Amino acid sequence: MTDNNTALKKAGLKVTLPRLKILEVLQEPDNHHVSAEDLYKRLIDMGEEIGLATVYRVLNQFDDAGIVTRHNFEGGKSVFELTQQHHHDHLICLDCGKVIEFSDDSIEARQREIAAKHGIRLTNHSLYLYGHCAEGDCREDEHAHEGK
């Protein structure tokens, strides 16, 4: 918990119980790409009395402070993940919503080449690749929203 206290203070945020609990849930392996609603449900399951409006407010504060990264994958629902030191891209299944993170040096190099060719110096980018799971009908997969 001390590390979370330090992280909040370093981000310029006051240490509060809702912020600590939300940060704790975001650090769980099963909550790598989580919506505000799913995070709220997890807090309820933990016996925490933190309202949905508070969850949204804290996630927006975390996004502004750089603690989380907001993604707007296909379907319009925002999902959040803890901001990571290493850059990665995402593969998203349009059927089940599964999100797979990947890194590929050749893709990164090609993006820099294209930007340079057009006179742009990249400072940031996001790559989302959408498709369908090769395993067939994955819509019933109960683990569909786990980040891998």
Swiss-Prot record:
Q: Write out the ranges of the annotated region (Dimerization).
A: 85-148
Where along the chain is Zn(2+) bound? H33, E81, H90, C93, C96, E101
What domain of life? Bacteria
One Gene Ontology term, aspect cellular component: cytosol
**Which BP terms in the Gene Ontology apply to this protein?**
negative regulation of DNA-templated transcription; negative regulation of siderophore biosynthetic process; positive regulation of DNA-templated transcription
Q: How is it modified after translation?
A: Can be UMPylated on His-118 by SelO/YdiU.
Q: Which residues bind Fe cation?
A: H87, D89, E108, H125
Positions carrying N(tele)-UMP-histidine:
H118
User: What controls how active this protein is?
Assistant: UMPylation of Fur by SelO/YdiU splits the Fur dimers into monomers. Fur loses its DNA binding activity and therefore its repressor activity, which induces the expression of genes involved in iron uptake.
Q: Which UniProt keywords apply?
A: Cytoplasm, DNA-binding, Iron, Metal-binding, Nucleotide-binding, Phosphoprotein, Repressor, Transcription, Transcription regulation, Zinc
Q: Where in the cell is it found?
A: Cytoplasm
Which InterPro entries does the UniProt record give? FUR (IPR002481), Fur_C (IPR043135), WH-like_DNA-bd_sf (IPR036388), WH_DNA-bd_sf (IPR036390)
Gene Ontology MF, one: DNA-binding transcription repressor activity
Q: Which CDD domains match?
A: Fur_like
Annotated segments matching region DNA-binding: 2-84
Give me the disulphide-bonded residues.
Answer: none
Presence of the UniProt keyword Glycoprotein in the record: no
The job of this chain, per UniProt, is described as: Acts as a global negative controlling element, employing Fe(2+) as a cofactor to bind the operator of the repressed genes. Regulates the expression of several outer-membrane proteins including the iron transport operon.
Additional information: Activated by cadmium, cobalt, copper, and manganese ions, but not zinc ions.
How it assembles, according to the record, is:
Homodimer.
What protein family is recorded? Belongs to the Fur family.
Q: What is this protein called?
A: Ferric uptake regulation protein
Q: Tell me what organism the protein belongs to.
A: Escherichia coli (strain K12)
